[in-house]
From Swiss-Prot:
The name this protein goes by in its record: Polyribonucleotide nucleotidyltransferase
Positions with a binding annotation for Mg(2+): D487, D493
Listed cofactors: Mg(2+)
InterPro entries listed in its UniProt record: ExoRNase_PH_dom1, ExoRNase_PH_dom2, ExoRNase_PH_dom2_sf, KH_dom, KH_dom_type_1, KH_dom_type_1_sf, NA-bd_OB-fold, PNPase
GO biological process: mRNA catabolic process; RNA processing
Listed Pfam families: KH_1, PNPase, RNase_PH, RNase_PH_C, S1
Gene3D superfamilies for this protein: GHMP Kinase, N-terminal domain (3.30.230.70), K Homology domain, type 1 (3.30.1370.10), Nucleic acid-binding proteins (2.40.50.140)
Source organism of the structure: Pseudomonas putida (strain ATCC 47054 / DSM 6125 / CFBP 8728 / NCIMB 11950 / KT2440)
Source organism, top-level taxon: Bacteria
GO cellular component: cytosol
EC number(s) from the headed UniProt entry: 2.7.7.8
Catalytic function, reaction form: RNA(n+1) + phosphate = RNA(n) + a ribonucleoside 5'-diphosphate
């Protein structure tokens, strides 16, 4: 073994890249260590031959966090890691997005990237180390790859400015969490959430990260120069120019006309007819050219047609100019029995979004490397096949659905009230019922509307918009509110969400080099204009949160008791609190500081539980008259229950002004009587009187 090690400074961190010691049978393998806090093993394996049956590039990225990395043993019966967590899925997507466009066009060999977190001190997120390791492993593998890439996380504080690769603690105090990845001369991917930062501040963070991760790119280049394998002798298939020209001559004008059909289903039907005609006319009897080759060339003609029209200033596919948002239709309160609902329609994209309020116990329990956490806010995105007029698989959420749901969550999370102000658990579900571009941003708008409809006190309404880019040479066009086709055929997917005041989320994926600062500025400017337009139309329907919660939502009552009384409310083995919950049908959460949250399906249930707790925690007041029940009679008096769990003694001498021979002459067990509290000693024993009640009443007690 002859390991090769490169160490470099990355901001305040020391990063070590090592290859040649572990996973030597992989095409490329790198062990990344950051400050001895995080260690990630990244392997890359590439197939030498392409599968001729696949018409796409089969790249897969798997990020996995091993519990042993944090000195933990997995929970559950089997005591081993199971299916990927949401965090692992999101990080896999984060790594995939900047590397996918850097594989050469036409490269169809299967490539698998596996990033394994093998050690962590739980101070920082391992995702940046995994991205650096992926860049290094690809660079030394010999697989055709137009990298390397660098990656960085950026935080922001108004007082100190931008901070590179912050810890979890620093992120918690930051108004920005942004991950940026790209090559030495281009930004390829941005993923972020923010607390109403300006467009200039967001762009500044992107440029700051790009400058800082040049150190990563240089170190990877040095590692590849010393330990890299020879680049594969791979060449793309020779383009069949003659066939391309023939198909374009025959069908080019018809394709151009097809893209003037504004209704998606009709447009797809017409283009499908033309594609079938091209296959019938040009695919050879001997299979030369093949039907798949004709379809591929037909797709290239579609690609060029749409792009040329856009950069030459012609109307877009649906007839809009570059800055116009599709017509909006906004409704709230569309579902009668839910807590909050909205139907948001933008052109042929539609989201039915529902907000549900729950108790603290409904919060999602997350078992992460940092430990167990409770998440009181969930946003789930569903994309059924009928939304695009297709039959398809129904089942659990896929990577795309998880990613879109997280983007929508990031967009609205900063505008939610603090937990001490609004202690409900919140779940928002976005059902995409129609889709033709930017369904995730429709989910953002719908989520904001549904939350306000539910009475969640949002700090401000949130809207989102998806921008696109078509760049041909020196010509470019930035598109507002892109269609699905424009997303597929364009060079950039640029999603911005925020309030009227600032940006709350920015996601960017770029497929080409050459995206300048000027282009990003134009995109952010157009996005702001569109966002304000959408917010204006949303505010006409519901401009602020409803003042009262939905009648269907659970009632919550917050109260606080003395910490010494917690055990009284809970009871032996939890018997008391269980009894209260069973009898009132409410749920009760008690914190160590004595804070209590009562949730009831009705106000009456919550009030009943509150009164039970007040009764248990109440103290007997000297000089106050209570109506109590005789619990037990003894020779020297009677014990009367005046409060839940609190009995006092009426001495035989305090039963009547007249002489009493037997207590049973005056009282019997179960009898209700009025008693006056005479005294409570330092041991909590309560002294009661029946004979002094009339005088106390007369004196106004």
């Amino acid at each position: 073994m002859n390991p090769v090690i490169k160490t470099f400074q990355f901001g305040q961190s020391t990063v070590t890249l090592e290859t040649g010691r572990i996973a030597r049978q992989a095409t490329g393998a790198v062990l990344v260590t950051v400050d001895n806090d995080v260690t990630v093993l990244v392997t890359v394996v590439g197939a030498k031959q392409a599968d001729p049956g696949k018409g796409f590039f089969p790249l897969s990225v798997h990020y996995q966090e091993k519990t042993y990395a944090a000195g933990k043993i997995p929970g559950g019966f089997f005591k081993r890691e199971g299916r990927p967590s949401e965090k692992e899925t999101l990080t896999s997507r984060l790594i995939d997005r900047p590397i996918r466009p850097l594989f050469p066009e036409g490269f169809m060999n299967e490539v698998q990237v596996v990033c394994t977190v093998v050690s962590t001190s739980k101070k920082t997120d391992p995702d940046i180390a995994a991205m650096i390791g992926t860049s290094a492993a690809l660079a030394i593998s010999g697989i055709p790859f137009e990298g390397p890439i660098g990656a960085a996380r950026v935080a922001f504080h108004e007082s100190t400015g931008y901070l590179l690769n912050p810890t979890y603690e620093q992120l918690a105090a930051s108004s920005l969490d942004m991950v940026v990845a790209g090559t030495s001369d281009a930004v390829l991917m941005v993923e972020s959430e923010a607390q109403e930062l300006t467009e200039d501040q967001m762009l500044g963070a992107v440029l700051f990260a790009h400058d800082e991760f040049q150190a990563v790119i240089q170190a990877v280049k040095e590692l590849a120069a010393e330990a890299g394998k020879p680049t594969w002798d791979w060449k793309p298939a020779v383009a069949n120019t003659e066939l391309f020209n023939a198909i374009r001559a025959e069908f080019g004008e018809a394709v151009s006309q097809g893209y003037t059909i504004t209704v998606k289903a009709d447009r797809y039907a017409r283009l499908g007819e033309l594609r079938d005609q091209a296959v019938a006319k040009f695919s050879g009897e001997e299979g030369q050219p093949s039907a798949s080759e004709v379809k591929e060339i037909f797709g290239e003609i579609e690609y060029r047609t749409v792009r040329e029209n856009i950069v030459n200033g012609k109307p877009r596919i649906d007839g809009r100019d570059n800055k116009t948002v599709r017509p909006l239709n906004i409704e709230v309160g569309v579902l009668p029995k839910t807590h909050g609902s909205a139907l948001f329609t933008r052109g042929e994209t539609q989201a039915l979004v529902v907000a549900t309020l729950g108790t603290a116990r409904d919060a999602q329990l997350l078992d992460t490397l940092e430990g167990e956490k409770k998440d009181p806010f969930m946003l789930h995105y569903n994309f059924p096949p009928f939304s695009v007029g297709e039959c398809g698989r129904m089942g659990g959420a896929g990577r795309r659905e998880i990613g879109h749901g997280r983007l929508a969550r990031r967009s609205v999370q900063a505008m939610l009230p603090a937990a001490d102000v609004f202690p409900y658990t919140i779940r928002v579900v976005s059902e995409i019922t129609e889709s033709n571009g930017s369904s995730s941003m429709a989910s953002v708008c719908g989520a904001s509307l549904a939350l306000m409809d539910a009475g969640v006190p949002m700090k401000a309404p949130v809207a989102g918009i998806a921008m696109g880019l078509v760049k041909e040479g020196d010509k470019f066009a930035v598109l507002t509110d892109i269609l699905g086709d424009e997303d597929h055929l364009g060079d950039m997917d640029f999603k911005v969400a925020g309030t009227a005041k600032g940006v709350t989320a920015l996601q960017m994926d770029i497929k080409i080099n050459g995206i300048t600062e000027e282009i990003m500025e134009i995109a952010l400017g157009q996005a702001l204009e569109a966002r304000l337009n959408i917010l204006g139309q949303m505010n006409q329907v519901i401009g602020q949160s409803r003042t009262e919660l939905s009648a269907n939502a659970p009632t919550m009552i917050a109260m606080k008791i003395d910490t010494d009384k917690i055990r009284d409310v809970i009871g032996k083995g939890g018997a008391t609190i269980r009894a209260i919950c069973e009898e009132t049908k409410a749920s009760i959460d008690i914190e160590d500081d004595g804070s209590i949250k009562i949730f009831g399906e009705t106000k009456e249930a919550a009030d009943a539980a509150k009164q039970r707790i007040l009764g248990i925690t109440a103290e007997a007041e000297i000089g106050k008259i209570y109506v109590g029940k005789v619990e037990r009679i003894v020779d020297f008096g009677a014990f009367v229950n005046i409060l839940p769990g609190k009995d006092g003694l009426v001495h035989i001498s305090m039963l009547s002004d007249a002489r009493v021979e037997k207590v049973t002459d005056i009282l019997k067990e179960g009898q209700e009587v009025e008693v006056l509290v005479l005294d409570v000693d330092n041991r909590g024993r309560i002294k009661l009187s029946i004979k002094d009640v009339p005088a106390a009443k007369a004196s106004g007690v």
